């Protein structure tokens, strides 16, 4: 774990170049949260997005082809992106989840959608191959309702532009689709 204050924020051109360098080699993008405090960047993720929307790579080394351990059994050929925060979050029933003392911020949600748009556009990844950790965990049998003690529910629901809670993957893919024409 590193502190964002000790890392250099990435600009979107750096992310575009990393995506170009990985063109045709990425199968999936998985979206997470760190379940820790803002400002903490973990090496399991290729990119981390802090509360203010600034984007960081662990060790200031952005390589989207590097193998990182972010999603059980699905790390090869994939990119992991995490929002910092959601420390002490509680799933409850999904729409009524409590994001804890450090919830996803609007700046983080928009930055994540922009990063997804860049990776999809420049690395040649289909928007249909972008999943939240909750979505892929549900497919693989360790998502909400599975009874698994290691249940993953990252980004199960998020507030949309109208502040209504909606499935997080739908929110993020919808925003990313809009940004793809603008990045």
Predicted regions and their residues:
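Generic serine detector
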Residues: 34, 48, 69, 76-78, ...
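Structural preference for beta-strand elements that scaffold enzyme active sites
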Residues: 28, 78-80, 129-131
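Basic/polar, cationic surfaces and motifs that engage anionic cell-wall
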Residues: 1-23, 86-183
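Short coil-to-beta-strand
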Residues: 73-90
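Short, well-structured alpha-helical interface segments that form or flank functional binding sites
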Residues: 42, 76, 107, 111
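N-terminal catalytic cores of peptidoglycan-degrading enzymes
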Residues: 1-75
